[in-house]
Regions:
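N- or domain-start disorder-to-order transition segments that initiate the globular core
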Residues: 1-51
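FAD-binding core of FAD-dependent oxidoreductases
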Residues: 54-114, 137-182, 313
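Alpha-helical support elements that line or immediately flank enzyme active sites
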Residues: 113, 151-160, 180-201, 260, ...
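FAD-binding glycine-rich core of flavoenzymes that anchor FAD
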Residues: 115-140
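Mobile "lid/hinge" segments at catalytic clefts and subdomain interfaces of large enzymes
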Residues: 150-234
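Short beta-alpha connecting loops at secondary-structure transitions
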Residues: 181, 217-221, 301-305, 345-356
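Accessory "access/gating" subregions that flank catalytic or transport cores
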Residues: 205-329
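C-terminal catalytic subdomain
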Residues: 310-365
Length: 365
């Protein structure tokens, strides 16, 4: 199957999953091609109206040479000379997973689909076609440049050959689709990991014969935090067939009773990551970005921005890592308690059997 892109509304986590995990192709819709073409025409009219105005990387050089204006002929020469993107720096033996490279390519198209990349339709089609070709290897380490130019240079080095015109080469390597893709990769997997963790901790509650009262329905009504409510409901789902009989008469250890609170914190981190990923994926992050024509600005406008920096992605990923580390700590405490509880057999072995239970694990520590 093929994901059809008509506008930025089509840049969803589900479509990203189809492209990156299932390996589907991308098709630029006829309507989107027309919109991109109209935008390109209006940008060129804007550029030709005053070739001395500042448009980063178009009427000026890039990087440290941004203050140097160049003549119209030099502007055309600069565009032609950058038709082939040179690979960025990097070192080490590890590479970004191929699914994430596909995510980067998909996310890159968000700037193009409605014309904000100020490029011709052929440029968007070239990028989309990369998903049907051998993928570049993107080094995991050594990307120490400003913004995301270095990793994007690695990816865009694999673009099909073709000349670039004014304003197009910078659109290939500026913006922040890499951080967006990395965050989306976390967002696509985090909820599944949380669901598995919830199931495992519910099993631990039953294995320890802990009371079910800390997970009662009445607590769902009292909880003010919506994420804790959801965590509690998800945990309770696994106790639908659990019996209240045969459980310890006193309260369970702390690491069992705080499960709703800790799982609720993970729920919140996952929800934030999903929301932030969805926003990042469908955002325009080019630099310079082309503002489409309006009644007050009939030719549109090119503006230098900080679109190459996604300030939300790293904190969202860090929070996910921190919350899952909390679950690892809880799992460690549960494991210790399950092997030291007076009401459970040593090494969790069947007293009537001749097995070792988990005794062999002690040799692996």
């Amino acid at each position: 199957m093929t994901v059809v892109l008509d506008s930025r509304k089509d840049f969803t986590l589900e479509n990203l999953r189809r492209v990156s995990v299932t390996g589907e192709s991308v098709l630029i819709s006829p309507g989107a091609k027309k919109a991109i073409k109209r935008s390109r025409q209006s940008f060129m009219a804007y550029l030709d109206s005053d070739r001395t105005q500042f448009i980063y990387g178009t009427t000026s050089e890039a990087g440290q040479g941004a203050s140097k204006r160049i003549s119209p002929e030099q502007q055309r020469q600069l565009a032609r000379s950058r038709s082939r993107v040179r690979p960025g720096g990097g070192f080490g033996l590890e590479y970004v997973p191929e699914r994430v490279v596909r995510m980067i390519i998909f996310a890159r198209l968000a700037n193009y689909i409605e014309g904000n990349a100020k490029a011709r339709p052929i440029e968007a089609q070239r990028i989309a076609s990369m998903l049907d070709r051998p993928l570049p290897k993107l080094p995991l380490s050594g990307q120490v440049g400003a913004g995301e130019i270095l990793p994007l240079a690695h990816v865009m080095n694999f673009l099909p050959e073709g000349e670039t015109e004014e304003g197009e080469w910078m659109a290939r390597i500026n913006g922040s689709p890499v951080s967006s893709a990395l965050l989306c990769d976390v967002a696509l997997t985090a909820r599944g990991h949380l669901s598995l963790a919830t199931q495992i901790f519910a099993l631990s509650v039953d294995a320890y014969a802990a009371p079910l009262t800390p997970y009662s329905a009445s607590l769902v009504r009292y909880a003010r935090n919506p994420h804790e409510k959801r965590a509690l409901r998800n945990l309770r789902w696994w106790f639908k067939t659990s019996s209240h009989h045969g459980r310890i008469a006193h309260q369970a250890p702390v690491s069992w009773r705080i499960l709703p609170a800790v799982l609720g914190a993970v729920e919140e981190a996952v929800a934030i990551a999903e929301e932030t990923a969805s926003i990042s994926l469908s955002s325009v992050t080019d630099n310079p970005v082309y503002i489409l024509p309006t009644q007050s600005e009939p030719l549109g406008r090119a503006i230098s921005t900080g679109g190459y920096h996604n300030a939300q992605a790293a904190p969202a990923i860090d929070d996910i890592n921190a919350r899952f580390a909390d679950l690892c700590t809880l799992a460690d405490r549960h494991t210790m308690k399950l092997h030291s509880a007076d009401h459970l057999p040593a090494n969790l072995a069947d007293p009537k059997g001749d097995g070792w239970g988990t005794g062999l694990l002690s040799f692996l520590q």
